[in-house]
Each structure stands twice: as structure tokens, then as C-alpha cells.
Design a protein with these regions (language model features):
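Mid-domain Rossmann-like dinucleotide-binding core that forms the NAD(H)/NADP(H) cofactor-binding site
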Residues: 1-66
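Glycine-rich cofactor phosphate-binding loops and adjacent beta1-alpha1 units
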Residues: 9, 51-126
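Structural detector of well-ordered beta-strand residues that form the stable sheet scaffold
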Residues: 18, 41, 101-103, 129, ...
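Cofactor-binding loop segments of dinucleotide-utilizing enzymes, especially the Rossmann-like FAD-
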Residues: 22, 45, 107, 133, ...
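N-terminal Rossmann-fold cofactor-binding loop
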Residues: 43-47, 82, 132
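C-terminal hydrophobic helical "lid"/dimerization subdomain
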Residues: 90-94, 135-187
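Short strand-turn motif at the edge of the Rossmann-like AdoMet-binding core
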Residues: 105-109, 131-133, 156
Length: 187
């Protein structure tokens, strides 16, 4: 889904891309934007994910809206919302430059309402796209992972056994965890 969303956003060389959310989708979006030749800013509250974002290609990694505005006062050419939180979806168009683009990749609970100010988007001619799964990008995504174009290794923060999975699912993730994977018979 990240690749499809980034295709929709169409980041270009020299553009500025703000990625909101430091989970797996956001960190993959950072790599894809960097591959396009964009300047990339990652917005996530987690200091561990900020560091990881910088290590995988983000030019900047910050924790607040005001930090973003300090770096890019006019806003970003492309804002990619990956957190799936009502507040960040509402914020996304406000951090785009006039004439900019927004892609919502984060999944919000079905039925949840998100306040957006249409006049601001109209006045500043912000394009907003929503992206979900697209089976036509799976082969290309797998190839990018297989050939190392996209590095997923740093996104796996913990490997757990099948026996540990129940406790891991029931417990809050450790600070900075991006993704735990289950490997049967893993000691």
C-alpha cells in the first residue's frame, strides 16, 4: 500500500516531502521519497523512530508541528500521512504548501469522522488523495525489497517465537518498536 500511495503522490526530484508517522508505512515512505530525489522530513513523536528515519534516509526528523514549520515555513510539496490518527489527517493539509499534494495512507477506524477545512484546501488548491491496497504494485514492491532498493531490515525491531506472540500482541509495544515478526521455533 505504501508504494501505491507514493505513486499517487508522485514525489519528484528536488521536491519536499513530509512523512507523518514513524511506523513501517511511514519509514517505507521515507525511503521511497528519497529514491525519487526529494528532500524528506519525518514527523513522529518517537525519538527512536526519528533516529531510525534519519538512518534510512530522512533529511530531517522532528517531533512537533512547529518543528516542521521551522524547517519548511511554506509547507511541503507532498505530505504523506501514515499515522492513521484523526489529528494527523486533519493536520496534513495544513502542512502542505499552496498547490501542494496530500496522500492519506494511514488507516483510520471505519466510521470515524475527521474535521477538515475545505475552504483552506480550495483557497490554496491542495490536492488530497486517499490510498489503500493495490494488488498491481505487489510485484514491484517485492522486487524493490529483494534487490535492496528498499531496506526493510531496520524496520524489524524484534523477532519473537510463536509462543511469545500472544503476550506480544496483548502488551503495548516497547518504546521505539517499529515491527515485531513471528518466526515459529525461534529461540
Amino acid at each position: 500500500c505504501t508504494l501505491h500511495g507514493m505513486d499517487m503522490g508522485a514525489a519528484r526530484e528536488g521536491e519536499t516531502v513530509l512523512v507523518i508517522g514513524g511506523g513501517v508505512i511511514g519509514l517505507m515512505a521515507v525511503q521511497l521519497a528519497k529514491l525519487a530525489g526529494a528532500k524528506v522530513l519525518l514527523l513522529t513523536r518517537s525519538p527512536e523512530k526519528q533516529t531510525l528515519g534519519l538512518n534510512i534516509g530522512a533529511d530531517y526528523a522532528v517531533g512537533t508541528e512547529s518543528d516542521v514549520r521551522d524547517i519548511w515555513p511554506e509547507g511541503a510539496d507532498l505530505v504523506v500521512e501514515c499515522a492513521g490518527v484523526s489529528a494527523t489527517v486533519t493536520l496534513s493539509h495544513k502542512l502542505a504548501r499552496s498547490g501542494g499534494r496530500v496522500v492519506i495512507l494511514g488507516v483510520i477506524s471505519q466510521g470515524e469522522q475527521v474535521p477538515i477545512e475545505p475552504f483552506d484546501m480550495l483557497f490554496r488548491e491542495i490536492q488530497m488523495h486517499f490510498s489503500f491496497l493495490n494488488p498491481f504494485t505487489h510485484e514491484r514492491a517485492a522486487k524493490m525489497i529483494a534487490d535492496g532498493t528498499i531496506n526493510v531490515s531496520p524496520l524489524v525491531s524484534r523477532i519473537i517465537s510463536l509462543e511469545e506472540a500472544v503476550l506480544a500482541i496483548a502488551s503495548p509495544p516497547p518504546a521505539g518498536e517499529v515491527r515485531a515478526i513471528v518466526v515459529p521455533n525461534h529461540d
